[in-house]
């Protein structure tokens, strides 16, 4: 996989007149014309922070990362826009270009389809916007698992359109807490972050009873994390 610098150089090509141009690292890289709309929208959104070329490079790489894993293509452009925007937002945070007054928490598991999605959903639910939550996978699946979504829904927590995302450096650099679940060796280590490993079974390998047990354990750990952050959980009685 080309480096992000290579993709930024590719972004310069996207910023000219072609969405089918190549680069030394990707001589026949072709992107749908509609990706240009994503570039334009995000270039405007991040115009005070990043060059159009940088935005285009991140959009191109994000599209490629997702397209390699996503079987359902219907929402690929929407997912690309969300994924690229989140990565650019993380990059701005990591580089100190924006100031945050909320903790940044990153949950990482292997597929980003089970444990990390559960943890992210619970933390969003209980924190109520007082924590910035991201999730990622070291070898992400193509979709969040329906059994996980159903188990969360049983306790009043929703995934709200979340999807598996490949782990990238900038989201780790942006985090205050990096919590891994079965993939700690795959997560880059940067100074100044608190790294935690939650030893949890992969719910996708369990029956429904086992999956619910993991769900409840994740819930308990998220509530403990909120206590550590000094944030009172909302609706913790559920």
Mark where each language-model region is.
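Short, charged early-sequence alpha-helical segments and their helix-coil boundaries
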Residues: 63, 68-101
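A short, aliphatic-rich alpha-helical micro-motif
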Residues: 172-173
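Conserved active-site segments centered on acidic
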Residues: 90-169
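Basic, alpha-helical nucleic-acid-binding regions used in initiation and control of genome expression
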Residues: 2-25, 34-37, 41, 50-51, ...
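Short glycine-rich anion-binding loops that position phosphate/pyrophosphate groups of nucleotides
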Residues: 113, 183-186
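Phosphate-binding/catalytic loops
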Residues: 26-28, 44, 187-238
């Amino acid at each position: 996989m080309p480096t992000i610098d290579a993709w930024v150089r590719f972004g310069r090509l996207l910023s000219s007149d072609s969405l089918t141009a190549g680069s030394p690292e990707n001589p026949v890289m072709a992107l749908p014309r509609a990706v240009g709309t994503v570039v334009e929208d995000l270039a405007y959104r991040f115009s005070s922070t990043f060059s159009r070329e940088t935005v285009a490079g991140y959009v191109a790489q994000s599209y490629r990362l997702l397209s390699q894993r996503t079987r359902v293509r219907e929402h690929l452009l929407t997912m690309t826009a969300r994924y690229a925007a989140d990565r650019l937002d993380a990059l701005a945070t990591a580089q100190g270009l924006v100031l945050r007054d909320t903790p940044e928490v990153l949950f990482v598991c292997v597929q980003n389809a089970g444990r990390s999605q559960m943890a992210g959903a619970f933390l969003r639910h209980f924190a109520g916007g007082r924590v910035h939550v991201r999730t990622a996978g070291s070898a992400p699946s193509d979709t969040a698992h329906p059994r996980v979504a159903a188990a969360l829904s049983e306790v009043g927590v929703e995934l709200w359109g979340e999807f598996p995302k490949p782990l990238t450096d900038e989201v780790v650099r942006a985090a205050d807490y990096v919590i891994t679940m079965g993939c700690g060796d795959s997560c880059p280590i940067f100074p100044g972050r608190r790294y935690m490993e939650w030893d949890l079974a992969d719910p996708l390998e369990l029956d429904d009873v086992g999956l619910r047990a993991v769900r409840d354990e994740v819930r308990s750990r998220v509530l403990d994390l909120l206590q550590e952050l000094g944030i009172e959980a909302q609706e913790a009685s559920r």
